[in-house]
From Swiss-Prot:
It catalyses: an acyl-CoA + acetyl-CoA = a 3-oxoacyl-CoA + CoA. The keyword Transferase applies. One of its GO terms (cellular component) is cytosol. This is 3-ketoacyl-CoA thiolase. It is an enzyme of class 2 (transferase). Its EC number is 2.3.1.16. CDD domains: thiolase. It comes from Colwellia psychrerythraea (strain 34H / ATCC BAA-681).
Amino acid sequence: MTIKRLTTSTGERIAIVAGLRTPFAKQATAFHGVPAVDLGKIVVNELLQKHDVDPGIIDQLVFGQVVQMPEAPNIAREIVLGTGMNTRTDAYSVSRACATSFQSTVNVAESIMAGHVDVGIAGGADSSSVAPIGVSKKLARTLVDLTKARSLGQRLSLLSRLGLKDLLPVSPAVAEYSTGISMGQTAEQMAKTYQISRQDQDALAHRSHTLATKSWQEGKLAGEVMTVHAEPYKSFIDRDNCFRENSVLESYAKLKPVFDRKHGTVTAATSTPLTDGGAAILLMREGRAKELGYKPLGYIRSFGFAAIDVWQDMLMGPSYATPIALQRAGMNLADLDLIEMHEAFAAQALANMKMFGSTKFAQEQLGRDKAIGDIDMDKFNVMGGSLAYGHPFAATGARLITQTLNELNRRGGGVGLTTACAAGGLGAAMIVETD
């Protein structure tokens, strides 16, 4: 198989110079009241400071958030304006659900490949603690009509049509817009479709927490997770607060299913918690990085995105996106040294892992003769996954990329796959490598 790499027209690779993230915090804990735009400003500002980057060399910033704040629809531009960067720095926002920072990274990489920019920042941030609370459709329409009313009588007439239920706040939807099916219900679908047992789900969650705890204890994450002093500045957080330091496998069996209480197997412990956090990546043209004296963490070798139907098992995106990225890289699964898969739910991760090794799935769904390949668990999520770290939707992709490259470097180099499912039946995969 021919080895292929993502390069500019002059043959220069796309370098990932550095990556950084905030600690990931459970909803309504350390970052309670801190909006995503501020989390984005915090992490980008620290990335620049930590790596002594002159803000003037940043040509482009692409950032994203999934839970949109109406008052700051272009989070990327707000980050530029709020961090002392050059106000002429190009900035725009993207959203690809849970694969958002994969998308922002690819957008910057493509700009470098095209020769439009030399240096860019990509990333994402989300806050489940500062969510946009809406109003009912009837109240929203009435409020618009009130602005057009010309008399007190007209206003009173409009208000009289509202009932008490019309005045109640509307929380952000947790279900797919097109189907009304929640992520948890989809995880239950997948557990049933692919025969993922409750015991296996519990075991994966326990493994994730155990490995994340070990990684923190060994200091592996200290260099890629910053300390944050958040408002009201009475305390600080310097590590994730989602993982369970004393995870005991037997304790998982005591929990009841939450999405299908009668026949289900997915519990709160085998689902990622609602999380706040931000993450950013500094990318450069390979030659520019050398000119500036930076030693890159690694390089983007290839990437792939995929989309599938949303009505059934829509979190199978990694199984569709991964073969695209592998083919573009000229690689097989066995060639990889590390595999990092977003664990939205234990059932989702296990279903994808199972289908990676299924010839039937490859032939019927992917149009391939052979399976993607069986996953070697010694390579899989070796530092734990999203079940332990948490999942600020737009930040997870950047976490996966940075964490994988740092671990590859600790192991002496190599090639790693990062992949994630996303709402809307989307999937993302990116292959990264070190020198």
